[in-house]
């Protein structure tokens, strides 16, 4: 949790847990204090004249004299927690990652079951995704139907991606497997030239489609979608799939109405095989929400951050109160 003026405070993820051995020292000090109080009582009981004892004993309640010691022990406990180095999860923007946006431009994307059409809605939502993605991420764009084409190689130039989205053209058939293999090749190419680490940058494919793969018809074919998804899994590249449309979509081809229902099952299977997540959207608003969710997942990474400062501040406050209490409660005034 995060408290005002104190910052994040947790009791987990200790970086230096061996500092808790200092608690034995604190326990020893508490035991010593108790022994000193018992010895003090024994010395006071040596007075045979109880009237004399009452005249020299403090008039105020004796329990208040323990407040400074209690606050001191509390401060030591708080300092011990701080020294043990508690940590908390911190989300920071990624500055070294590759995302390939793979969009289906087959004829089924002409369907108007999503206003104004599946394609236009896809373009608008993808532009929003490009705008919101953290600046350090390299974003690439692939359009596919019967073949897959890299329209924009992974780059931090968002305008290039948005301009390419405006120029998407319809084509026949749907070769989802080829599109995934093309995305993996683009990721491997840019990963070889991006510096900043000893390992390739983290990568992800965002696959947007509305229908079944038609080329090849068997997704387990060597060039099929399921085979490509397994390859992505082997290369550590999860695929986030978005199936877009409704079961009632249709297009007019040669003056004939052709039903083009959305195919959720294939997309879910692709995501599952690759180790990614699947989403579905039937409206532009839902699609925007999906892209926003993906942006939060892809654009940020979670690291361990220091959470000891709040405990240090509380410890310092307790120590200051202990000193103040010692001055106010245990002061000696002349009589």
From Swiss-Prot:
It is a multi-pass membrane protein. SUPFAM superfamilies: vWA-like (SSF53300). InterPro entries: Aerotolerance_reg_N, UPF0353, UPF0353/GerABKA_families, VWF_A, vWFA_dom_sf. Pfam families: BatA, VWA_2. It is found in: Cell membrane. It comes from the Bacteria. Keywords: Cell membrane, Membrane, Transmembrane, Transmembrane helix. The chain crosses the membrane at residues 18-38, 67-87, 309-329. This is UPF0353 protein MRA_1491. It comes from Mycobacterium tuberculosis (strain ATCC 25177 / H37Ra).
